[in-house]
């Protein structure tokens, strides 16, 4: 029974039907609504908890994949052999969303100005191209690319110009690929890539076959050949000189040779610069004595290699994984807590059955990139990665490849492109260096009239004059070698 104070004023219809009046305290509507809200909240919490628990493993894997090149960097089977199809699809959605978010991000005022100017230059370049003024069009295309190097429209149109006007299908395909990594839904870039991808792959394969032919020609020269022995000795000095030079060492080639031959100090140079050269010497001797003949390369081998690289510079850090976070330009390597896992994965990849089916140059270049991307050490990552690359090449019958220090900017540019999604330009760069090294060996051991391969030049006129010389005599050979040893200039 309701008290008088609780009595409501029921509608007349309810009273006529004889239904007893409801008290406010007995009204079921608020209680029912309250129960529904509780059920909804509980259901939402349960669904969220289930989703979080079921996706924890995938999220952890995605976090680990952030630290190593993804399928957009390397071949899918290189990195995703341990993941299911569902996880791969989830990662693809994760990647595509992150790309879309980055494309949709707001630009700074300066970036907006550059993009506006770049698109204007792009329209002018297309008009000039249609008018037959190819040279002016090329300069404007390059200007647009410099202003907006990651704008899909600029990459796409410049790629089309390179493909159809310059007949440079390899570089055109590279720009189409870049456009797709930035804008995966770009139908024009996708159509262009479908047209060029197979052609470019065929060209790359033919290039590798050519390298194999030159390697076989070099392998046919007997070890007792005096010219070959001299070329190997010279290449040894060159390799150390250029590898430490890439990292900023200021020693000249003559000074590097003097330190290695006499073990005497060079006036005016720091102790660290001396020790960097001696460390590389120790590491290369370790490769020749131990690693070239090994079947598998292990983490321990890489640590021993690094221990020698830093043996004279920083013996405490040599052969040890870093314990702090490092930053390399725009690249943020994985944290120290992730290094053990990533290096174990790297070791498995190095010795996997699939890796053994890769062409030696591809395999060595990929190993170089993977290791430098993990960046497991405080210092010496680049030198150790290049030494590992040459170890793998030497096991396949190739000579140690020289990456000239004058190519430092290109070297880092191609590594940056790999970080952005396309490893192929870096592999081609390593193939270029491999071919130049092979050409020098073959020329040094040949008495047949042929064009002289020039690896380094100081000025264009001298480079052209020397490159045009046929069948050089002894004096000419000597002058060319001195010219090469000067250590300045660029790869033509």
UniProtKB/Swiss-Prot annotation:
Homodimer. The keyword Repeat applies. Belongs to the fic family. The fido domain mediates the adenylyltransferase activity. GO terms for molecular function: AMPylase activity; ATP binding; Hsp70 protein binding; protein adenylylhydrolase activity; protein homodimerization activity. InterPro entries: Fido, Fido-like_dom_sf, Fido_containing, TPR-like_helical_dom_sf. The side chain of Glu-247 determines which of the two opposing activities (AMPylase or de-AMPylase) will take place. In response to endoplasmic reticulum stress, mediates de-AMPylase activity. Adenylyltransferase activity is inhibited by the inhibitory helix present at the N-terminus: Glu-247 binds ATP and competes with ATP-binding at Arg-386, thereby preventing adenylyltransferase activity. In unstressed cells, disengagement of Glu-247 promotes adenylyltransferase activity. PROSITE patterns: FIDO, TPR_REGION. Residues 1-17 have a biased composition (Low complexity). This is Protein adenylyltransferase Fic. Its EC number is 2.7.7.108, 3.1.4.-. It catalyses: L-tyrosyl-[protein] + ATP = O-(5'-adenylyl)-L-tyrosyl-[protein] + diphosphate; L-threonyl-[protein] + ATP = 3-O-(5'-adenylyl)-L-threonyl-[protein] + diphosphate; 3-O-(5'-adenylyl)-L-threonyl-[protein] + H2O = L-threonyl-[protein] + AMP + H(+). A motif (Inhibitory (S/T)XXXE(G/N) motif) lies at residues 243-248. The keyword Magnesium does not apply. It comes from Drosophila sechellia. ATP binds at residues 247, 328-331, 379-386, 411-412, 419. GO terms for cellular component: plasma membrane. It is a single-pass membrane protein.
């Amino acid at each position: 029974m309701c008290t008088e104070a609780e009595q409501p004023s029921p509608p007349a219809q309810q009273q006529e039907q004889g239904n007893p009046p409801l008290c406010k305290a007995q009204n079921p509507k608020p209680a029912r609504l309250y129960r529904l809200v509780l059920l909804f909240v509980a259901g939402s919490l349960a669904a969220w908890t289930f989703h979080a628990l079921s996706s924890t493993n995938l999220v952890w894997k995605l976090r680990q994949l952030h630290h190593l090149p993804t399928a957009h960097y390397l071949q899918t089977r290189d990195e995703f052999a341990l993941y299911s199809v569902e996880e791969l699809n989830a990662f693809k959605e994760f990647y595509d969303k992150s790309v879309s978010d980055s494309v949709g991000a707001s630009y700074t005022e300066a970036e907006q100005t550059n993009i506006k100017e770049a698109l204007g230059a792009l329209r002018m370049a297309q008009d000039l191209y249609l008018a037959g003024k190819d040279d002016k069009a090329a300069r404007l295309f390059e200007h647009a690319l410099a202003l907006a190097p990651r704008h899909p429209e600029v990459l796409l149109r410049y790629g089309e110009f390179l493909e159809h006007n310059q007949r440079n299908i390899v570089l055109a395909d590279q720009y189409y690929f870049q456009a797709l990594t930035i804008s995966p839904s770009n139908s024009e870039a996708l159509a262009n890539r479908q047209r060029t991808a197979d052609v470019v792959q065929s060209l790359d394969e033919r290039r590798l076959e050519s390298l194999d032919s030159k390697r076989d020609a070099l392998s046919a020269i007997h070890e007792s050949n005096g010219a070959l022995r001299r070329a190997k000795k010279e290449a040894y000095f060159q390799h150390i000189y250029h590898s430490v030079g890439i990292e900023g060492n200021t020693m000249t080639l003559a000074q590097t040779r003097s330190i290695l031959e006499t073990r005497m100090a060079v006036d005016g140079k720091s102790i660290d610069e001396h020790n960097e050269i001696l460390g590389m010497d120790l590491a290369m001797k370790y490769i020749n004595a131990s690693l070239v003949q090994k079947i598998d390369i292990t983490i321990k081998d890489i640590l021993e290699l690094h221990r020698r690289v830093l043996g004279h510079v920083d013996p405490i850090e040599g052969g040890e994984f870093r314990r702090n976070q490092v930053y390399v330009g725009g690249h943020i390597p994985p944290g120290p807590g992730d290094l053990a896992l990533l290096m174990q994965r790297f070791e498995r990849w190095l010795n996997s059955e699939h890796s053994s089916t890769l062409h030696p140059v591809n395999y060595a270049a990929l190993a170089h990139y993977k290791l430098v991307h993990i960046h497991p050490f405080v210092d010496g990552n680049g030198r150790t990665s290049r030494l590992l690359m040459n170890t793998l090449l030497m096991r396949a019958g190739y000579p140690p490849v020289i990456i000239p220090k004058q190519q430092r900017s290109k070297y880092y540019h191609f590594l940056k492109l790999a970080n952005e999604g396309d490893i192929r330009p870096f592999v081609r760069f390593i193939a270029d260096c491999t071919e130049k090294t092979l050409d020098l060996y073959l020329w040094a051991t040949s008495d047949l009239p042929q064009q002289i391969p020039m690896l380094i030049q100081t000025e264009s006129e001298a480079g052209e004059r020397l490159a045009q010389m046929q069948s050089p005599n002894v004096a000419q050979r000597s002058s060319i070698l001195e010219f090469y040893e000067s250590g300045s200039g660029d790869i033509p």
